[in-house]
Amino acid sequence: MALLITKKCINCDMCEPECPNEAISMGDHIYEINSDKCTECVGHYETPTCQKVCPIPNTIVKDPAHVETEEQLWDKFVLMHHADKI
């Protein structure tokens, strides 16, 4: 499941540089997460770094519109970072 940045976002710029998949970018009003790139940090870290660094609780949550299993997130990570070795 990809993550989603809610309207609680204060545009503090903490999450964007921490994303190892470059899935976070500035949207029209707040930061947004590209669900095609978000692996919830599977393959990189045990927990999503964007959630760790966000100063506002419950601002970055699981996106119910993009449900993925741990295996699907892993496969996405492998395709993005190790496709040349497949």
Swiss-Prot record:
GO annotation, biological process: tRNA wobble base modification
PROSITE patterns: 4FE4S_FER_1, 4FE4S_FER_2
Keywords: 4Fe-4S, Electron transport, Iron, Iron-sulfur, Metal-binding, Repeat, Transport
Binding site for [4Fe-4S] cluster 1: C9, C12, C15, C54
Cofactor: [4Fe-4S] cluster
Signal sequence range: none
Sample GO molecular function, one term: metal ion binding
NCBIfam families linked to this entry: di_4Fe-4S_YfhL (NF033683)
Biological role: Ferredoxins are iron-sulfur proteins that transfer electrons in a wide variety of metabolic reactions.
Co-factor note (free text): Binds 2 [4Fe-4S] cluster.
Stretches that traverse the bilayer: none
Pfam families: Fer4_7
Binding site for [4Fe-4S] cluster 2: C19, C38, C41, C50
GO cellular component: cytoplasm
Protein name, entry field: Ferredoxin YfhL
Origin organism lineage: Bacteria, Pseudomonadati, Pseudomonadota, Gammaproteobacteria, Enterobacterales
Domain 4Fe-4S ferredoxin-type positions: 1-29, 31-65
